[in-house]
């Protein structure tokens, strides 16, 4: 009798739980259908799942009681079981809706009407992918076993069984990789619709047999497995796009790790099928082609030579450097130019251009570069004695002499080799004061030993030919190791055509030495005066001499960067011959010359406009340094403008409206509104005080108010855990949170007085 009463009590408790669970399920189900967004729906769906699991456990218990013979009246149990099953059906509907909500009805309809051929193709493709993954996993297992065995055989040499096992594993790895390559090729052909699904199905059994039984001792492989698929006729583009599944580098790692002499054969796997030969050969050819291309592209750098750009000197033939055997022809200009000079040159007028002669040998002690030389037509000779012409003012660097170094110079200049190179720039100014019209080369050199000399033809002192009063002369910026063209050649490097003034007959011809000219150029552009004599420049300082010697002995292979000049950069003014003996000086404009390597500038370098602007902006920014508070959000200031109200309205707030008792009579939502939207006011303080009196607690991490829904399940010194109700100020509503851990360090527990 007592057992029956006990059983009836259990049944009553179970049925009570069922009714409560069904009510809870109904409540959550209503919330789910009224949910506004997807996150809430997911949350309610999870709650539904929990409730339905509880009901399912109760249903199992009820089914047990229904099956037993101890209970006579089973109607109530059966009704409750059906009620639970009804809720289960409702949950299945909800679950189906949530799973298919991302797809439209049309999409679901199309999904049911899949093309059978497409479905078959997808199944075969999935089988190929799974088989490739299985083979790759087996390859990884083999490789790890080979590695461990290699370590053991290294410690114990002469273990023949382990070496045989290693060799067998390597053969398995080679065959597996061969099959992986073939299957990947078939998979790509299937994606490209270049192979039939039935053809793949024919080899499916053999491939599965290989995957399952390839390690059996009595396994016999079908060597003609892929012959029917005609993989030898694969387009090359299809093979080229194949991603490398495994590189041969792993084999080389095995070779290095294994000490057996026969392990070297694994670096190039030989598949049993001839279909692989095509793939292997094509891959080897591609590798060889890539290496050949890279070797060809790197060959100039390997040989240590620099490629010569053909568009820089299209007509300048290369001449080996030799010493001249005799004096150069009259009115010819021999000067040095860098090999990479790319400055455009204005062409000389036809009257000043003479026939091009073959390149004369020129002395060059620097690096060889293409040579270009121009020979101008000789001027008509006069009946009187020949007057020596002043050479173009040219410093010469390196231990060389002038162009007449073989004893053939007829001018009065003395060329000084070694210490007269221009050091503060890549190009020097050179100019000439002439007393009779002829072609004169204004040349410059950047530190090599090829000085230039212009020899004028013999002419009378008082009868200069008027037709040649203004002849173009060439000013070519030069560097180390090249020859610049003269005025009569427009095929070489750039040249500037400069009109020269004519000296009156009464002015004596000044003669310069190369050392004096170099000294003048180190101190700046040469200044020509109307005096008949020119003062000798000051001797070179020790700093300049040291810089000069350093530049000469540095042995720079690359030519000094050339100065890019245009007709607007250098303005040379000339005047016609005045009747008086005075001659106006030659005017030169300033140009910025880049420094050559190893040369110190003579004075501070002036800043450009852009650099000055940047400096001014930096200085201005220094006075307004950013502060960390600049990153904070700016709080807008809203002034309180009192609005004039009629006198019959209340002019003062109602009494006792600023007390805690007044705020306690307000609703909870009003208190939350005051707390969140009247920040920094007394009203916020009073609202917080009223909320605390209603047992709400403020969480300083989430900035939300929490209230216990029930007694916490766990209470420690650091936290308490249980079910809480919190006010979500973003969605403006109260939410329930189960199993929430409220850490006391985030509890705002100041006593509000």
Curated annotation (Swiss-Prot):
InterPro entries: CCR4-NOT_su2/3/5_C_sf, CCR4-NOT_su3/5, Not2/3/5, NOT2/3/5_C, Not_N
Biased composition (Gly residues): 396-408, 479-491
Domain of life (superkingdom): Eukaryota
Keyword Phosphoprotein: yes
Family as reported in the entry's similarity comment: Belongs to the CNOT2/3/5 family.
Self-association state and partner proteins as the record states: Component of the CCR4-NOT complex; distinct complexes seem to exist that differ in the participation of probably mutually exclusive catalytic subunits. In the complex interacts directly with CNOT2. Interacts with TIP120B and NANOS2. Interacts with EBF1. Interacts in an RNA-independent manner with BICC1 (via KH domains).
Biological function: Component of the CCR4-NOT complex which is one of the major cellular mRNA deadenylases and is linked to various cellular processes including bulk mRNA degradation, miRNA-mediated repression, translational repression during translational initiation and general transcription regulation. Additional complex functions may be a consequence of its influence on mRNA expression. May be involved in metabolic regulation; may be involved in recruitment of the CCR4-NOT complex to deadenylation target mRNAs involved in energy metabolism.
Designated name of the protein: CCR4-NOT transcription complex subunit 3
Annotated source species: Homo sapiens
Gene that this polypeptide is encoded by: CNOT3
